[in-house]
């Protein structure tokens, strides 16, 4: 059952500003407004802004305000609602909120306005995620992707998934209702083909949700190498800031130095690590220990080598560290000097010179391509943890159904798994009956959203 009681919150954030916004929504919220707001005329037409004064029960003026009125179902929540634009002082905003609460509203929970929008069919869960990402976005590309998801421009894969599952369910019902009909090899092959397509679509959706995660949560990139190969210089060149100290003395960097780079819309946190070698003192040991921790946590590793020196034991240690890592870029610095370094034939290095500032754009391009691969902006979606779990469960069920068809199991049994598969896909959009799951989805929203 949907709670349609009146809720209220400071939507503009509890910070001092020129204007504060108090959002109010729920059944009879307009009646509440009439108790506390005194405009020139006391009849409220929706989608208009009214000037007037807020007064308490003693007719004391609380603030001079502008009020926007919205009528159900044409509001953010789908309910009658209004927003008060007051002066943005902390005390004034709190006084206005207290006035609303004293007259029948309760304080909204985090994300409760958006939860009501979802429950009233104003948005689906993909759009709810998009609203969070609009707020979190740190780059223009992230904003573009979030707006695309909010406007349902990038839900093609999900709609295609639903259509294919519905087709299989309909075909299976025919077999249940008419058991005398034999399942021909042609029909079986058609079903298996569709299941293969469903599997590929789910895998594609999981992949593109991972790409979406990069744009909103960012990527950790660790620069590693032995001392004095130019790791700090590379950090400075990549970010365009002299963030790290650069000297000719090996082992200058003893702690992790980080800086953020906006790489074509992807926020990248670049970590300059301490040079990895056999440590000479406790401080260097701690720095190297942190370097190994950064390597384990990194999404991508940039391993830097000095091309002007022959391969030594410390370089070999670096190669051993990265040999089983998935996303690694090998960089040969000091390419302006005579090359003496020889690497294994299976390595495709990127040659740069931090001194001459060459090769940096090539490195950035390789880094970006490693992240996005065959990324298509129109297909990238942002999913929360629950939705990703549902997708992975759907993938398992699709494979289970395929085996059931091959083994000629009873269509009635297959029907159960098809329904479960459909339910998992519906969870991505938002067909969720469990209130606890819904609360978990919306608890990460800010208060007033």
Where are these regions (language model features)?
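A glycine-rich (often HGG/GG-containing) alpha/beta subdomain
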Residues: 1-144, 148, 152, 163, ...
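C-terminal-of-GTPase-core extension/linker across diverse P-loop GTPases
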Residues: 2-10, 14, 55, 140-259, ...
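Short beta->alpha junction loops/turns
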Residues: 25-26, 89, 250, 307-308, ...
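Switch I (G2) and immediately adjacent beta-strands of P-loop GTPase domains
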Residues: 51-71, 251-279, 297-300
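Glycine-rich, N-terminal phosphate-binding loop of Rossmann-like dinucleotide-binding domains
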Residues: 88, 238, 273, 305-308
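Conserved beta-strand segments of alpha/beta enzyme cores
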Residues: 106, 267-269, 348
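Generic enzyme active-site microenvironment
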Residues: 270, 304, 331
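Inter-motif core of Ras-like GTPase G domains
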Residues: 284-308
């Amino acid at each position: 059952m949907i709670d349609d009681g009146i809720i209220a919150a400071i939507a503009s954030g509890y910070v001092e500003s020129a204007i504060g916004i108090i959002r109010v929504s729920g059944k009879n919220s307009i009646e509440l407004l009439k108790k506390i707001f005194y405009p020139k005329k006391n009849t409220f037409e929706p989608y208009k802004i009214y000037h007037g004064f807020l007064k308490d029960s003693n007719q004391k003026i609380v603030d001079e305000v502008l009020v926007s009125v919205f009528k159900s179902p044409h509001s953010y929540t789908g309910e009658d609602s209004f927003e008060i634009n007051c002066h943005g002082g902390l005390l004034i905003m709190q006084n206005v909120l207290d006035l609303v609460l004293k007259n029948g509203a309760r304080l909204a929970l985090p994300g409760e306005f958006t939860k009501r929008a979802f429950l009233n069919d104003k948005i689906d869960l993909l759009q709810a995620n998009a609203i969070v990402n609009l707020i979190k976005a740190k780059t223009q590309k992230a904003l573009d992707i979030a707006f695309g998801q909010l406007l349902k421009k990038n839900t093609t894969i999900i709609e295609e998934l639903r259509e294919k599952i519905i087709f299989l369910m309909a075909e299976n019902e025919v077999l249940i209702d008419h058991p005398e009909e034999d399942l021909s090899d042609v029909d079986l092959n058609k079903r298996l083909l569709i299941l293969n397509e469903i599997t590929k679509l789910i895998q594609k959706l999981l992949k593109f949700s991972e790409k979406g995660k990069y744009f909103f949560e960012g990527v950790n990139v660790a620069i590693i190498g032995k001392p004095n190969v130019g790791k700090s210089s590379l950090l400075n060149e990549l970010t365009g800031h002299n963030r790290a100290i650069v000297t000719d003395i090996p082992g200058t960097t003893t702690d992790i130095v980080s800086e953020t780079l906006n790489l074509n819309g992807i926020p990248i946190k670049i970590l300059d690590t301490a040079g990895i070698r056999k440590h000479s003192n406790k401080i260097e040991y701690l720095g190297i220990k942190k370097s190994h921790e950064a390597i384990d946590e990194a999404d991508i590793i940039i391993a830097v080598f000095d091309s002007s020196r022959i391969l030594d034991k410390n370089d070999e240690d670096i190669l051993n560290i990265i040999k089983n890592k998935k996303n690694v870029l090998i960089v040969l610095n000091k390419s302006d000097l005579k090359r003496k370094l020889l690497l294994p034939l299976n390595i495709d290095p990127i040659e740069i010179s931090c001194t001459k500032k060459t090769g940096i754009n090539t490195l950035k391009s390789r880094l970006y391509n490693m992240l996005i691969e065959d990324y298509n902006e129109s297909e990238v979606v942002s999913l929360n943890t629950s939705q990703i779990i549902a997708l992975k469960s759907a993938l398992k069920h699709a494979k289970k159904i395929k085996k059931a068809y091959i083994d000629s199991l009873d269509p009635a049994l297959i029907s159960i798994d098809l329904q479960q598969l459909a339910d998992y896909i519906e969870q991505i959009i938002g067909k969720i009956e469990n209130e606890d799951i819904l609360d978990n989805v919306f608890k990460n929203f800010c208060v007033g959203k």
